[in-house]
């Protein structure tokens, strides 16, 4: 009896100790089927440190050597501001176009069966497999004033190559797979019987799309939009040929950074890159928060 009392007292003292409280507060990690959690976690942290954090820290450190006045002057010159407007504007327009047409392409690939469907599905990934420089040369050859498509458009008064329109076209070309491949698994998991049940209860096609399909696809849709937008901000190879690279007109920010590096202005290049990085990160974080909010709202609506 005394031994049981002493054991209970020891357990009570252990539970009231800091270590005991910590064990009760922290959830126990489930035993994994595959061993090596600490090794995998260590490898992940080292990878993030060497590949992500160290380069970004170096970027911020190098740009800080300019001082605040030099940094502000480097990132607010008229040439730099013009490149910001062109890069962010073209990336935003291209991502919006890809969001619309990507939804249509995904719907056709998932909901319809037709000859050549697998070929069309494979062609969606073509911009992933094609080197960006090859894509840029191909688009330039097509839409140049003497190109197959550029010559007829030129006669109609539409100039594509060496204009902001050509930049938007190139970003649209490389960004479409991000939207399609993000939406496709979500749409495949959406049961068509739910739509049929809503239609049998009197819902119109527009109501089915607006209240059933789009709310389920919206988080993935935002993710695809964000990925296409982020890819457009940093795209260089497919844009540099068709842009024309005229300062204040068709000069994109990645090209301006390369120009600064060729002029050995490393601090100025890192300053421009820092502004682009911070702005794109804030935009992507905002989109991510909006995506999480819409997912929570969509989950709470049925209850």
Model-derived segments and spans:
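Transmembrane alpha-helical segments of polytopic membrane transport and secretion proteins
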Residues: 1-44, 286-303
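Membrane-water interface segments at the C-terminal ends of transmembrane alpha-helices
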Residues: 32-67, 74-188, 212-237, 241, ...
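Short coil/turn motifs that cap or connect alpha-helices
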Residues: 115, 203-205
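Short glycine/proline-centered loop/turn elements that form peptide/ligand docking sites
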Residues: 190-194
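The alpha-helix within a helix-turn-helix
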Residues: 198
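Glycine/proline-centered hinge or cleavage motifs at structural transition points of membrane proteins
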Residues: 201-202, 215
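Juxtamembrane non-transmembrane "cap" segments at the membrane-aqueous interface
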Residues: 241-250
């Amino acid at each position: 009896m005394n031994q049981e009392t002493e054991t209970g007292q020891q357990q009570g003292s252990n539970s009231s100790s800091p270590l005991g409280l910590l064990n009760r507060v922290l959830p126990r990690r489930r035993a994994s089927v595959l061993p090596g959690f600490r090794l995998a976690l260590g490898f992940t942290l080292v990878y993030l440190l060497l590949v992500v954090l160290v380069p970004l820290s170096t970027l911020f450190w190098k740009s800080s050597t300019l001082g605040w006045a030099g940094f502000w002057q480097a990132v607010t010159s008229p040439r730099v501001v013009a490149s910001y407007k062109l890069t962010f504007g073209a990336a935003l327009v291209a991502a919006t176009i890809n969001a619309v047409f990507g939804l249509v392409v995904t719907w056709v690939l998932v909901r319809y069966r037709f000859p050549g469907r697998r070929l069309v599905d494979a062609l969606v990934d073509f911009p992933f497999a094609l080197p960006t420089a090859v894509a840029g040369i191909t688009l330039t050859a097509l839409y140049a004033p003497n190109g197959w498509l550029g010559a007829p458009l030129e006669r109609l008064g539409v100039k594509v190559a060496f204009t902001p329109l050509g930049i938007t076209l190139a970003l649209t070309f490389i960004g479409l797979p991000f939207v399609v491949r993000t939406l496709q698994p979500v749409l495949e998991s959406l049961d068509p019987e739910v739509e049929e049940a809503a239609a049998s209860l009197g819902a119109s096609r527009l109501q089915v799309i607006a209240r059933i399909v789009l709310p389920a696809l919206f988080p993935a849709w935002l993710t695809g939009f964000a990925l296409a937008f982020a890819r457009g901000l940093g795209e260089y190879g497919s844009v540099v040929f068709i842009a024309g690279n005229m300062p204040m007109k068709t000069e994109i920010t990645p090209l301006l950074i390369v120009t600064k590096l060729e002029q050995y202005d490393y601090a100025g290049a890192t300053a421009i890159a820092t502004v682009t990085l911070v702005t794109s990160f804030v935009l992507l974080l905002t989109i991510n928060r909006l995506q999480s909010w819409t997912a929570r709202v969509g989950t709470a609506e049925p209850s």
